[in-house]
Structure formats: structure tokens, C-alpha cells
């Protein structure tokens, strides 16, 4: 692969990644060409390659110039002829002038010929081409074309694997036929053979698929198109005179007379679509729709153009001896012209004897007459499967957040069966529905104070116009694309109204009779919901869907789109497993990078929140946090874990935290006017108000005690500020005396607390503690107060906090009782808090996985997490236009470095690539400098034009030592070749200021300069007292968060077992596998069958200790009796 040349150790991430990826690609046997000018031998091989391809001079010169440029900047590992093939393909796909003074795309040089002459397989080409696109900085439209080309190849490879067994099911084995004798030109033409039909049917299918661009990379529709081709060829084969030599007599779709079972003979060819669907994972309704609207009109056009010869009225006769040779030849020629004109892959290579070498997969059909597979064929089939798994083109990987409760697909499940199952589930969900609101939904909408029915209908109409405009047919393509778009949108409308009704019903159950007009009038909610429905429909037809295309055409910000995903999953129980995985994957993409784009509304929400990012502890329920350093007791008095920090989190949050979040919470914004200078709301939490919290940055402003004088300095609070009174505080004076004093403070404009001088009794005299008020730096706020920050005295805050509000009239209003963990709850229900709760959980899961693979201890993992949280809270601009994984990997490296447990970037990225969401672009193309809008920075919360500009004042104030130069990776020198393109100067560089580089450049130039001061607090050289406490780490969920419906016909669900105290045992029956008696299972079956609930006496829960509804158990005898009942239950269950 490509790697920077002349880099000192350790190597840059691109080089490290390349070498390891090449080992996966199997290129280790090839020699590597060092960076520099290409040798004469390479140029000679290139000239020979161009001569064999009959390449024109312009493409030849451009390809060689591109290769020279790449070889001077990168070390091209592997066969140099393979890299030359990539350069030639790019040059061949450029627009060239024509004789008619127009332009044509490509020079009609086949990609298949390029690969054959360069002795490169398709899988190798796709792997090399992705790296060449990164090095050459090719424009997005070219990358999209390559991705579509690879997707078409993957779809065809998967379908070809299905084509073989289906063909062998309805036709005889091609190996069983006798070899044909040589005949003269004037001899009578012989009937076609099964081998010829095998080739003809496949070529006819791929030619038809190529002429339907909207379904060429659509797995479900392409598969049904194949079934249509087999159905047509099979029907024609039954009318041949030698049909007994062609058709498999064991095929279950026909009777002995050659016609489908349960049908009457007719002149039209028989239709076996329904039988093929039932035998081979097809959907009858979809297949018949493809046959009627796509296949038959297209085949009729082929008859009109004389590409197929026979009876046009019933589409038969092309397999007759007089027509087959001409038809086969004409279709082959037409397909060759299509491949040369479009630069597409020649998918006939699947039929060749050298398919193993050309595709890197397998050869056609079975390699031996016995029907067994050879070892080479099995090996090549495994290679294809590895490529499919690695490319993730047709399958949805389990998100890392779900690997604990979602298993990978079974080996026997194919991509086709998975896709058809998803589509079948969609049809089941929409059965009997129409693309209009139901009577119940209409009634619900009319009951709102402002009926949104008309607004909803108008919005859907506008979105349909926008959606259909993106599927306008080309001149050479039929109107099928728009018909397909109409069909998808109609399904999405049905799903939209169905989910909307479920969402409103759930909201009414949670909120009671509250008017929902406010939520139902939100344009972002409805657009996001319909876009989500369209994504589900698109995914069901063509995995992995069209995200983010659908959200972008409707101009739905990703920050708003993510909010509806969980709402959608909770409201629709009929979603199949793959769809849920896909939606979870989309949510992860939004959380880790899409929501952090420059123009994202997220930055507006942060600005509305007074430019403050909440910490993990503030947005995460306490029972979802790791607290190994303390005993966490609900309702206990507030005990600050960090010196100099006033905490307002609660111990027991009740059920409201774990309950599903309402739409009001998801689409709410941080309240500015009522909470800007208040610690808590005036309303009690029980009344549904949003409780306030002390802002995370800065928390406390300290008053350094310089001397102890006899003067008393009075402080007059400003009206509108919040007066904070500490019940007790301990002050140690210079003479060693320790006294207890009252301490007061005022909430400052930054949201923190400024303590002012108070009267102190030292040695029997009333004296005042005075001094200048100086705010602490962000680093000091995260840690303890050092001797440089508080001199002469030590201030400790062990007691509860009382909050007083100063009214404009100068009076202090008591805002409640002293602050305790049982009476105060952080604000956790705003849309911004919900977003960061998910971000922290996602980051915690990924970091835990990386630390496990890197063999990092739990102690270091928590330090890494604290560093990562610091970067998010104090320096959120580091995430702008960047990726969450980039900050995680940098945090791992820097904390491992300062704690003397070095982990190289190469090793970190090697483990990162094993995660399902990993992409090479994450560490190869990181934003270094770009045009940034003003929004905030680490210290003054205002973004710099470049994140490399540091706040020198903050750096000079901090007393922490500077990180040693040998603790960082070397910065690439100008003379050395960068591992990835640094400045976008290619065709896609619309922003001249934007500069990108690899992860190490980002670390050295930006990340280290903003994090090093904080990170060095955890170094071994730093004193233990100056080490900030560690941030709490989020727990990893161990169970599935949603229930699963077993059958669409019966309301039977499987869900994680909940706490017994939150359920009503008298209305439910529980069966515990390998624990409950068999009688309990019979009662459940009886209740499902009859609909009657068993009597209370028979509903005693013997297994979990629940009390009998008929008779109470004495508390003192409860445990002994429970043990005896449990023993009886176990004995009965074992029989």
C-alpha cells in the first residue's frame, strides 16, 4: 500500500495501516517499490501493458504522470503493475472529445482487459483502487463510481452463487451432457445444450440488469430479475424438442407433461415464478411485479430490435435450433458494447474457466461430474466471503454497542435470504394499510388544540416532489426509476402514519391528556420521521440503504435525524433484526462524526447552553456509572468527591430517568432565560420541571487568602445573582490553627461560584479573610487547589450547601432546603443532555473494547476516559469536522505515554481496525486546518480560525511542566513525504484553506498542544495531591434494550426480565427456564390459547419470592418458607 517515505520511527499511521492491510490482502509476496522516481524496468513494463491494451497516447501519458507523482510521494507496496493498472483505469475514465465535437466518458478500454493484462484479480483491484483514490485525492464523483462498481460486482457475485443451485434445480447438470461432435458449416444446426443455456441465461440477465441502473446494485430486485430470467428460459426450454435432455425431471414445479402443476396447458410459456420463490427465498409479489413492469417490457424490446429471435407475441422460440445461435451472439455483442461504453465490469468472467484468477473467487458451476467441490474452489469461495465480510457492502455489521446482545448471522444465512426476509417483514407490517391516516389517527389529530392534519399532508406532498425529482429518468432509460421511487415513497407514507399513530399513543400514555400540538407542529420531527421511514424501505430493498442521501435531499440535519431513531424503534415492534441494526449503525455515525459538522445545529445548542458541554456524570443516571472509589448511597448528604468543586448530582433518580424519553424532551432546547444565573428551578422536580445544575466549567472561583487582618470586607450581592451559603468550612491559618467558619459565595456570570471574604474568629478576635478574586484555569478546575492557588490557608467544604436567590429588591429568597443528593437532581432531559448521554456511552463502549485489545489496565482506562471527557467538555472544537474515534485514539496514546505504558499509534490503529465501524479515512484524513466559524474554544469558548492557535495566556498561567519532546511522535519535516495528502489541491478542493493530514499530524500539531497540560497531571513525576480525580466511567449494558415480537399474528414478546417491584405480578405469569415447573408453562400456553387469565391461587410466583395474592407471609418466616417453596419448585421442575 501507500506509506510516507523517509519517516522516522515510529512510522506514521498511514504507513502502519498500509502494511497491515496489505497482509490481509495477500500482497506480502510482492516486492515493494521504494519512494522515488520509477525505474526503467517499470517504465518498460508499463509500455508493454499499454501496447497490449492499445491505449491511446493521452491516457498513456496521464497514467504515467500520475504514477510518477504517487511513487515520488509514497512507497507503493506490492506489484507495481497493479498500481499502474489503477492509474490507467483513472485515465481511461476521463472525458474525451468525440468527432462530433462532443464528449464521451471513457476511451472504451475494458476494465476486464486492464486487469487481465496486469494479472490482477478484481478483489485486489478494488483494494488497491481505494488506496489510490486516497493518495491521488480523486473527486467524490469518481469515488462514488468506483463504490458503485464494487457494489455491482458484489451483488453479481452473491447472485451468481444463488444462480448455480437454482439452475441445477430446474435443469440438468452441464457436466452430464455428452461432448458435441465437430460439424461442418452446412450441417444442420443442433439443439442447444444445458451448458449453452447456462451461459445464455446469465448473459441475458446481466445485460438486462445493466440497463436498469436503479436496480443494478439492488440485491433484492436484481435477484428477482434473475428469477424472471430463469422463468423465461425455463418456459422456452419446455417448448424445445429436446426438453427431456435439458429439464431436470426432479424439479417440483412441473408435472410429467412439462407444465406447471395445477395448471392447464396453453400456448404461453408456463410461469414458475411462484415455485422458484418458495424454493429459493424469493418474494412472490415483488418477483411478479419485477416481471410485469421491468422484465417483460424489456424482453419485448429485445425482440423488436432482433436481438432475440422467435415469437414476439408470447416471447418464445429463441431456444429453437434456428434462432439460438443468432440470439446468443447478438446478446453477447450488445453486452460487450454496453461494458465498453460505461466502463462497467464484464460480469461474464464468472462463467470463465479462469474465474479464480480473474475474480479472486471461484469458477463456474461444479468442478467435477460427481457434484463435489474441489479444494481450490472451496478456497476461492472462502476468499470471496472474506471480501464480502471486509467490504461490508451487503451486510450490516453488529454495532459495537450491540455485540453483547445481538449475535452475528448464522453461517447458513445468505445475503439474499436476509434481504428478502427484511422485505417480507416490511410487507407484513404494511399489510392492510394505506398511505393516509387511519380513522383513529384522524380522530387523535382532530382532538389537538390545533389540528395538524392539513399541515402533515402538505408536508408529505412537498417531500414527495423533492424525492421524485431525484429519480427523473434519463433519455436512454425507461420511466421505471420514477415508478420505483413512487413505490418506495408510498410504502414510506404507510409506515409513517403507522409509526406516528403509535408514537402519539405512547406519548399520551406517558403524559396523560397533555396537548401534543406543540410537538406535532415541529417540522423537524415530521421530516425526520418520514426520512427514517424512507430509509427503512430503501434498506429493505437495497441494503445497506441510502443514508445519508435521504436525509440530505430533505435537508434534515443529522442532529435532528438521530432523535427520531429510538422513537421509531420503540414505536414499531415489527421491525426485523437487520433493520434495527441498520438504524443503530446510523445513530452511531451521527453521534461519532456527522452531528459534529461545522454547520450542524449542535453548535447552536451548545451556544444556547451558554457555551457549556455537560460532563458524563451530569447526563448519565448514577446507576449507569462506575463508582469504584466510593460507596454510592441514594439519599445520602452531598459529599464532594473533588476538592474545590460543588457537586449537585443526586443519588437516587427514581424511575423517570430509566423511562423512555418523551418527544418534548428530545426536541427541547436548553433554557437560557430562566436558568442562566440560577442553580435550581423554583418548581419542585415532582411537578415535572427541569431541575437546574451547577455548570461544569468553571465550577468554583477561589479566593486566595493572602493575610489575616482586622478589617471586615463587606460584599453586597448583585440583584439577580444566586447566593450560595456553605453550612460549614474549615480554614487552617498560617499559625496552624484550624477554625470552622461560614462561607458564602455568589454565582458568577460564567455559571460558577465566586466565594467572597467572610469573618473569621482566630485567637478570639474577629478577623476577615481577604484577598483578590481570581478565577481558576480549566485544568485547575479539574483537579485540586494547589499551593499557588490558595496560599496561607486551606479551605475545605465538608458540609451541605444552602441556596439563596437574591431578588432585584435586594431580598434573599430561600430556594429550598440544604442541598442533598435526595433533593436535587441534575438537568438530564434536554435534547443536548440526551445527545451527550449517547455520545459518552458510545465512546465508553469503544474505548473499553480498545483497552481490552491493547491489554490496558482498568486504572489506565479510567485515566484515558478522564482525558477524553476533558477534551469534549473543555475543548469541544476539537470535534468540529472530526471523528470521535480520532480523539479516543489520541487520548489512549497521550495517557499511555505520560504514565510510562507506551502504546504505539501503529498498535492502537491495528486494534481500532477490528472494530465494526472502523474506516481508514478516520486516521488517514484528519482535518488539520479549515475555515471555521466562531463558536467557542477551550478557554474563552470562541472558535479560532485554526485549532492550532493556542491560548497563550492559559498556557502561561498553568504551572504544570511541559511534555517532553520525546514523548510525542515526530512532526513530518517539509522534505519528507507525507503519508497522506495534506492540502486539498485536487479537483474536489472547494475550500482552499482546508488542510488535512493523518492522525499523527493532528496529534502533534493540534491535540497535544491543547491536552498536554492536563495530561501531565497524571504523570508519575506529578505529586499525588495535584492529580485530578478520575471521571466516572459509563457502564456497558448487558441486555437488549427492546422487546422482540415473536409473531406478527400474536402479541407475544420476548424482553429482558425487569425488576419485580416495577411490575404487577398479579397480572403476569413468569416462566424461568430450567427453574420453573412445567405446570407454569402449561398455564401460559393455556392463557395464550384461551385468552383467560389463571386464578390468583394458581398464579403464585414460587420462583422469585413474590407473595401470594391470597395469603400474606409473615415477615419473620418469609425467608425460611421461601427456601422450602423454592426447593419444591426445583424438584417439580426436574421431573
Swiss-Prot record:
- Cellular component annotations (GO), alphabetically ordered: chromatin; nucleus; transcription regulator complex
Report which superkingdom the organism of origin falls in: Eukaryota
Pfam families with a match to the protein in the record: DUF3452 (PF11934), RB_A (PF01858), RB_B (PF01857)
Explain the post-translational modification. During G0 and early G1 phase of the cell cycle, phosphorylated on Ser-636 and on 5 sites within the domain B. Phosphorylation on Ser-669 in G1 leads to its ubiquitin-dependent proteolysis.
Residue ranges of the region described as Domain B: 825-1021
Stretches with biased composition (Pro residues): 971-981
Keyword line: Cell cycle, Chromatin regulator, DNA-binding, Glycoprotein, Nucleus, Phosphoprotein, Repressor, Transcription, Transcription regulation, Tumor suppressor
Q: Where is this region: Spacer?
A: 614-824
Q: What are the start and end residues of every segment in region (Disordered)? A: 1-43, 649-698, 806-825, 932-995
What role does it play?
Answer: Key regulator of entry into cell division. Directly involved in heterochromatin formation by maintaining overall chromatin structure and, in particular, that of constitutive heterochromatin by stabilizing histone methylation. Recruits and targets histone methyltransferases KMT5B and KMT5C, leading to epigenetic transcriptional repression. Controls histone H4 'Lys-20' trimethylation. Probably acts as a transcription repressor by recruiting chromatin-modifying enzymes to promoters. Potent inhibitor of E2F-mediated trans-activation, associates preferentially with E2F5. Binds to cyclins A and E.
What family is it from? Answer: Belongs to the retinoblastoma protein (RB) family.
* Name recorded for this polypeptide: Retinoblastoma-like protein 2
